[in-house]
């Protein structure tokens, strides 16, 4: 059995128009190109660490949007000019973006994965 009590009141900053790579240095950033709700946070912040702690079955509440259950967690790392996962899949940045943000999931939380001191070694999608 697992019980997680986590309450964070997060301020969400929109990305500047035309800058889909912008992530606010603190807090959460709303990803402008997501078909649903895409929220980004650096893994060095409390928000990013909270994203990384989520597991399938956990519930995330977004005020005015509702409750969402975590159904999948995907980990991707950068290999050459592609993104790779543990299952051996290899995708371009555009392919990964469509897969994650193309509309299958109404809410996506994203942070980076640190590995060996490289804080942007990979990407974590919840």
Question: Each predicted region: which residue ranges?
Answer:
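Solvent-exposed, non-transmembrane regions of membrane-associated and secreted proteins
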Residues: 1-126
């Amino acid at each position: 059995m697992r019980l997680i009590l986590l309450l964070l009141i997060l301020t969400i900053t929109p990305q500047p128009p035309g800058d889909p790579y912008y992530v606010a240095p603190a807090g959460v950033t709303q990803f402008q190109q997501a078909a649903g709700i895409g929220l980004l946070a650096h893994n060095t912040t409390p928000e990013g660490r909270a994203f990384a702690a989520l597991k399938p079955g956990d519930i995330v509440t977004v005020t005015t949007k509702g409750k969402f259950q975590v159904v999948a967690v995907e980990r991707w790392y950068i290999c050459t000019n592609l993104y790779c996962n543990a299952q051996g899949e290899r995708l371009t940045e555009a392919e990964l973006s469509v897969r994650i943000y193309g509309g299958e999931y109404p809410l996506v939380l994203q942070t980076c994965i640190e590995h060996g001191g490289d804080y942007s070694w990979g990407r974590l999608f919840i």
